[in-house]
Amino acid sequence: MKQLTILGSTGSIGTSTLAVVRANPQLFAVKALVAGRNVELMTGQCLEFRPAYAAMSDKRAAEELRLRLKDLNVATEVLSGEQAACDLAALDDVDQVMAAIVGAAGLLPTLAAIRAGKKVLLANKESLVTCGRLFLEAVSASKAQLLPIDSEHNAIFQSLPASLQQQLGYASLENNGIESIILTGSGGPFRDTPLVELPHMTPDQACAHPNWSMGRKISVDSATMMNKGLEYIEARWLFNATDAQMEVILHPQSVIHSMVRYRDGSVIAQLGSPDMRTPIAHAMAWPQRVESGVQPLDFTRMSAMTFAQPDYTRYPCLKLAMDASKAGQAATTTLNAANEIAVAAFLASEIRFTDIAALNVAVLDTLSCQEPQNVDAVIAIDREARAAAQALLPRFAAKRASVI
């Protein structure tokens, strides 16, 4: 029986992880749950899975959860704050940690799990985007095991030789006969929207992904293809890939989740239904396989699979991320922080959809940071970039108001 801590249990990855636990109660047990403010959902999760601990980032939410669980006679100990999340990620009797807190907020708890030598199921791509080299050094020093959860990175992982799977972040692709890694992306809901209409797209339209069911922030990132850009950065770190060893292509059907191109002309792809329970179940059970609850892919019901090159005019955020990856860790940290502010402002209807990329560019142009040498420096860059983005927001909000 594997004991599990879930960081971000009330989000889409967290609930999918619990669905896999539910499908395999003889294999997995929940030791601890960590979430933000969703007391209603966390109460239900504690009632069903009876974890020893639950932590909320918000102190008031934790107090409300504590009262609700007491009324329900649930013995789960309730904690609050960032340190509690870090402590639960490093519990002695926890075997694996699902790192699924969205954004830079997930960095320190994920690092705590790494430093404790846990098997870390990495869904928080920002850990590598903001802290790639330092993160992988911590993995190496602690002998922790890293398994990717993002459908694309999990697909790549499954398409790699076993020797490479054991050496994430350090093995040579070239020495293993690999020419390139091919990241696929659907292109989001605005793939065919006329460019002149993009400024007028609403948050609800941006969150209506054609294939995947996701949270609102990642749905907007999919619409801008910033999500693919962050995955590009993450893939370079995870698989020790150069810019020349990376390809990004559009695949609207989201059936092929990513591919690996080999020197002999072979291309190995991982296919499946667009359901995050598949990569989650794979990582939780690796190197074995378990039931995920996902409907099998029915090839007889599939339409043709199509592919195309991404248009950077339509997806400037993708190009921004690729360029930031070449510039270094300070640039990727700055971009990630600016984007989180920009997406939150768009979801609050404060700026237009196309202002997300424009605000990201403005913050990158404003800041000039030295490469971080430790986690504190990364956090400082993140904080500075967020402040710069907040300071620039009124300019874009005024522009939106003048258009309405």
Curated annotation (Swiss-Prot):
Cofactor names: Mg(2+); Mn(2+)
UniProt: NADPH binding residues: T10, G11, S12, I13, G36, R37, N38, N124, E126, G215
Coiled coil region boundaries: none
GO MF terms, alphabetically ordered: 1-deoxy-D-xylulose-5-phosphate reductoisomerase activity; manganese ion binding; NADPH binding
TM segment ranges: none
Annotated EC: 1.1.1.267
Positions bound to Mn(2+): D150, E152, E231
Species: Erwinia tasmaniensis (strain DSM 17950 / CFBP 7177 / CIP 109463 / NCPPB 4357 / Et1/99)
Domain of life: Bacteria
Family according to the record: Belongs to the DXR family.
Record-linked NCBIfam families: Dxr, PRK05447.1-1, PRK12464.1
The protein, known as: 1-deoxy-D-xylulose 5-phosphate reductoisomerase
Biological or metabolic pathway of the protein: Isoprenoid biosynthesis; isopentenyl diphosphate biosynthesis via DXP pathway; isopentenyl diphosphate from 1-deoxy-D-xylulose 5-phosphate: step 1/6
Keywords: Isoprene biosynthesis, Manganese, Metal-binding, NADP, Oxidoreductase
Cross-referenced PANTHER family: 1-DEOXY-D-XYLULOSE 5-PHOSPHATE REDUCTOISOMERASE (PTHR30525), 1-DEOXY-D-XYLULOSE 5-PHOSPHATE REDUCTOISOMERASE, CHLOROPLASTIC (PTHR30525:SF0)
Reaction catalyzed: 2-C-methyl-D-erythritol 4-phosphate + NADP(+) = 1-deoxy-D-xylulose 5-phosphate + NADPH + H(+)
GO BP annotation list: isopentenyl diphosphate biosynthetic process, methylerythritol 4-phosphate pathway involved in terpenoid biosynthetic process
